[in-house]
């Protein structure tokens, strides 16, 4: 199955979501098996309907998109994703320069909507085709399919990278160059797991460690210098 990146039209309209706490990208995965299950059940084939009903329920859980209250803290960098911190390491980013990379692993049970780590202007959203290796393998940040979103904040630059994995083969990015983001605002998602990396300037007071659980748009992962 080939990977694919989806983009919105840019601006607020491109980032519009459904009113229900479910990401709009999830409805086909929820409604189609639900309709099949209903049809089978109505025709008396209830046992055959069960797998489709289960698939619909699982998709409803996967594509959940709860409302979040983002803290208003000066110079704070919010987690761009739900998950577990798998790496905190010095790195060099083409946009940020000398940086600290905070890598977050998203399991299939996590919320998979990505959120802006800080308020600022999207300078670019750069997609790169690549492999679909497991998210925990070293070096996948440079070899896997990914989309890097470069954000110019009030005082610093930050890069967020959506990285596809073995099961996650569709990156959804709803922003483009020139869009403005607020801290904690939704900007995309990675379907069915994988990893989100956040590059912050070196010297940032990193507030998380490997193994910590983080919540997108809520957990402060660092304070800018």
Residue ranges and their predicted role:
Residues 2-225:
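Contiguous, well-folded functional domains in the mature portion of proteins
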């Amino acid at each position: 199955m080939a990977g694919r990146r989806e983009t919105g039209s840019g601006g607020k309209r491109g980032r519009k979501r459904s009113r229900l706490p479910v990401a709009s990208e999830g409805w086909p995965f929820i409604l189609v098996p639900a309709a099949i299950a209903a049809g089978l059940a109505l025709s008396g084939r209830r046992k055959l309907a069960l797998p489709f009903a289960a698939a619909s329920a699982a998709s409803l859980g996967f594509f959940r998109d709860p409302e979040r209250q983002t803290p208003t803290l000066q110079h704070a960098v919010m987690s761009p994703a739900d998950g577990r911190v798998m790496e905190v390491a010095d790195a060099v980013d083409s946009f940020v320069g000398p940086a600290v990379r905070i890598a977050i692993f998203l399991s299939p049970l996590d919320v998979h909507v990505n959120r802006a780590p800080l308020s600022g202007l999207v300078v670019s959203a750069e997609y790169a085709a690549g492999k679909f290796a497991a998210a925990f393998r070293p070096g996948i940040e440079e070899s896997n399919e990914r989309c890097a979103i470069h954000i110019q904040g009030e005082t610093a630059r930050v890069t967020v990278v959506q990285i596809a994995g073995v099961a996650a083969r569709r990156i959804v990015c709803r922003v483009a160059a020139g869009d403005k983001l607020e801290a904690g605002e939704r900007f995309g998602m990675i379907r069915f797991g994988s990893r989100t990396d956040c590059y912050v300037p070196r010297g940032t007071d990193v507030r998380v460690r490997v193994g910590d659980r983080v919540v997108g748009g809520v957990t402060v992962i660092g304070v800018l210098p």
